[in-house]
Design a protein with these regions (language model features):
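Polytopic transmembrane helical bundles with strong interfacial aromatic enrichment
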Residues: 1-143
Length: 143
């Protein structure tokens, strides 16, 4: 990559890879976003199976989306720090496909949430599975 963008990306990669505090901060933000977003989503997914019916706070979705925003930004920063490794990694692309599936499932889940029933349970089960598979893929990327 050449030009100003290439120079900026190379500068970021140098800073990220050579500065432990920067690397740690970005990695922490990524893990914290997954923990908060995934934890809240898993809690809501579990509530969908309650015999009393789902009691899901509508503000929960904003928290999950905010956490996903943190994951997106920190993930982009990690990607830009090592483009060659990530862009050629099958695990990375599988993880990205899982993230797209999670977002699509979340869209459907929000639409069926008020009705409850079998579709809420299905999207909740899929959500829990996708969050855990994304975590597994992310773990495979860093090990």
């Amino acid at each position: 990559m050449s030009g100003a963008l290439g120079t900026a990306i190379a500068g970021w990669a140098h800073l990220y890879n050579d500065n432990h505090a920067v690397n740690t901060t970005v990695t922490f933000a990524h893990f914290a976003g997954v923990l908060v977003g995934g934890g809240l989503a898993l809690s809501a997914d579990r509530a969908a199976f309650s015999p009393l019916g789902p009691a899901i706070d509508p503000r929960l979705h904003r928290w999950v989306l905010g956490a996903l925003g943190v994951v997106f930004v920190s993930g982009m920063l990690m990607l830009l720090a090592d483009l060659q490794t990530y862009l050629t990694s099958a695990v990375f692309w599988i993880k990205m496909a899982l993230v797209v599936a999670l977002l699509a499932n979340g869209y459907v889940r929000v639409r069926v949430e008020a009705r409850g029933g079998v579709w809420l349970r299905r999207t909740s089960a899929l959500s829990a599975s996708l969050w855990l598979l994304i975590l597994l893929a992310g773990t495979m990327l860093v090990s």
